[in-house]
Regions:
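Internal metal/ion-chelating core segments
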Residues: 1-72
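Loop/turn-rich, solvent-exposed surfaces of beta-rich toroidal or solenoidal domains
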Residues: 106-107, 127-197
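Extracytoplasmic beta-rich repeat domains
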Residues: 2-4, 29-53, 77-94, 101-103, ...
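Short loop/turn segments that connect beta-strands within beta-propeller blades
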Residues: 20-24, 68-72, 112-116, 156-159, ...
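WD40 beta-propeller blade core
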Residues: 17, 65-66, 108, 153, ...
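Blade-level signature of beta-propeller repeat domains, shared across WD40, Kelch, NHL, RCC1
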Residues: 107, 190-191, 212-240
Length: 240
């Protein structure tokens, strides 16, 4: 879910709803789906301003959509091909574009435009770089994507070209957070990695073991504090 001011946005068993944070009252419901095997979303909604219009970006099991946060009106919707609807990562806005990728599909960059009060989206390019569960970080016009193949790659957002792909990494999942030209990656096996956003090569600066059990929860950052939740505990570290 996404907490934004006095609202909570949730993608439940079918569609997306906006709730009052204080009371739990449903403010609106949108994008109702059939439910069942293809209902409900793995992804999380995110707020962004694209082409001058405030958006709630929502990735369902079959499509990436832009909604009006106040009303739930669907501004645009673009199909995203997946295997069994596994759209898991959170879409990432960059300028007036949105990057996403899906299991069993491809990576996509969609551009958002506004003309005569109407907002629309179109696909700018696709790439074979296929993410799985890990939401990419976007730094200086490049996406750093942890792939289904357990490799990290760098994608040029202007062209969709893959600049490099790392050798195989043991972990299935990374959660990543950017800070300037560096980013942190927490592996599901409890390793915290510090990497430089290098468009020429995989650039690992340092890594340490921070957990004794699996760490599937996303990294949480509060100022210079890094919060890491493992199966049976919570740890805090300082990021300098």
């Amino acid at each position: 879910p996404l907490v934004d001011g006095e609202a909570v946005y949730v993608q439940p068993g079918a569609g997306v709803i906006k709730l009052d944070k204080a009371t739990g009252e449903t403010i609106w419901r949108s994008m109702d789906e059939d439910g069942g095997m293809m209902g409900g979303a793995f992804s999380s909604p995110i707020r962004a301003k694209l082409a001058g219009q405030e958006h709630l970006l929502v990735q369902s099991r079959s499509a990436l959509c832009g909604l009006v946060p106040e009303t739930g009106e669907v501004l645009w919707s673009k199909k995203v091909k997946t295997f069994r609807g596994m759209n898991i990562l959170t879409p990432v806005p960059y300028g007036d574009t949105v990057f996403t990728s899906a299991y069993g599909g491809r990576g996509h960059l969609f551009g958002v435009e506004s003309s005569d009060g109407a907002v629309s989206a179109s696909e700018k390019w696709t790439t074979r770089a296929q993410a799985y569960m890990s939401t990419p970080v976007l730094i200086d016009g490049h996406a750093y994507v942890y792939l289904r193949s357990k490799r990290l790659c760098c994608v040029d957002l202007a062209s969709g070209d893959v600049k490099w792909t790392s050798s195989s990494i043991a972990d299935e999942y990374w959660s990543m957070v950017a800070n300037g030209d560096r980013f942190l990656a927490l592996t599901e096996s409890g390793e915290l990695c510090l990497l430089r956003a290098n468009t020429e090569e995989f650039d690992l600066i340092d890594q340490i073991e921070v957990a004794d059990s699996e760490t599937w929860a996303h990294l949480a950052i509060d100022g210079d504090q890094i919060l890491i939740r493992e199966l049976d505990g919570l740890s805090a570290f300082t990021w300098r």
